Amino acid sequence: MNYFNVGKIVNTQGLQGEMRVLSVTDFAEERFKKGAELALFDEKDQFVQTVTIASHRKQKNFDIIKFKDMYHINTIEKYKGYSLKVAEEDLNDLDDGEFYYHEIIGLEVYEGDSLVGTIKEILQPGANDVWVVKRKGKRDLLLPYIPPVVLNVDIPNKRVDVEILEGLDDED
């Protein structure tokens, strides 16, 4: 069975079994809703167990979650650094122009026929996602996921066509 990252447990929160999670999903409200089941993977990416979400709330840049039947810091402290993943069968169908992070990360970015680099990360600073493109011999390029910049996303061919607008690339 395939699993996809939705978050990483970065710390505990208080004494009642809550954990701070750094989310890597656009669907945090759905993934971390009460009753949702996620797979817990250790730092070596080995499956540990399936967990059920007992509660979820947002706090600053973190999602604060609690697992069912784990209500004390001593029970959950060992999970710091572990990843939360969703099973492939639990992924929802997306609308046209929407993609899961695992589909985007690793795609090659082209401007015309020139290879710009490879998408290595997706940031969520505000209204639009920002794709971090790793380039050879240059600093990473930050590309906003907006229509004037991202012209075409071709998942089967692992290719993204872009137009780098003036001001986006400070090395040119």
UniProtKB/Swiss-Prot annotation:
Domain (PRC barrel) ranges: 96-168
GO terms, molecular function? ribosome binding
Record Pfam families: PRC (PF05239), RimM (PF01782)
Q: Which cysteines are joined by disulfide bonds?
A: none
SUPFAM superfamilies, alphabetically? PRC-barrel domain (SSF50346), Translation proteins (SSF50447)
One cellular component term (GO) for this entry is: ribosome
Question: Carries keyword Signal?
Answer: no
- Sorted alphabetically, which keywords does the UniProt record give? Chaperone, Cytoplasm, Ribosome biogenesis, rRNA processing
Its main localization is: cytoplasm
Subcellular location(s): the record lists:
Cytoplasm
Q: Name one GO biological process term.
A: ribosomal small subunit biogenesis
The written remark on domains in the entry is: The PRC barrel domain binds ribosomal protein uS19.
Query: Assembly state and interactors?
Result: Binds ribosomal protein uS19.
Free-text function comment from the UniProt entry: An accessory protein needed during the final step in the assembly of 30S ribosomal subunit, possibly for assembly of the head region. Essential for efficient processing of 16S rRNA. May be needed both before and after RbfA during the maturation of 16S rRNA. It has affinity for free ribosomal 30S subunits but not for 70S ribosomes.
State the family it belongs to: Belongs to the RimM family.
This protein's name: Ribosome maturation factor RimM
Instruction: List the top taxonomic levels of the source.
Output: Bacteria, Bacillati, Bacillota, Bacilli, Lactobacillales
